[in-house]
Amino acid sequence: MLRRSLFFTGLYCALLNLAPIGISDANAAADDVLKAENKQSAPLSILPLWKRILEDYAFEGSIEPSQKYRAWKKFIASIENDPPIRQLLKVNLWFNGFPYKQDNWIYGEEDHWATPSEFLENGGDCEDYVIIKYLTLRRLGFPAKDMKIAMVYDVFSGTDHALLVVDLDGENYILDNRDNMTVAAHYTK
């Protein structure tokens, strides 16, 4: 179980279905790990990086897939009949097996959001894990409205970090490339 504490100096979530969101009040109980001000998300169409991901992802489906891309599709097919909680666990674990690499190592850029093909070939940083996990869960039938990208600050490592938060039957689960477990948000104290 995920026991490390992440203290968030800021939590900015965006629902990937372009809808506004609400996050728990910053004055919530001190042990609530998801403390933040109520925020509204901006339409993701204004985010050029996300737009590029969606355009490239649509294009990737029209070309001959690489061996790793075919393995991804085979992985999705292998878990499509699993219960949703098992799908979350397997998606988190499978992608966490890919190498973590910073954008400047791979692309020579400070911030690059990898398409599925790029991630599958090169690995990636935390946003890239979130993107591929999000797209995989969408392919498995998870509604966009039930998934959020959480941008957090980890005071222990001194870095910004991205997580995927998935609402499953009213419970928020965190998928994190730094931890192979998928846990309910209220267990991350």
Model-derived features with residue positions:
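N-terminal export leaders
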Residues: 3-7
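A structural boundary/capping signal
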Residues: 22-189
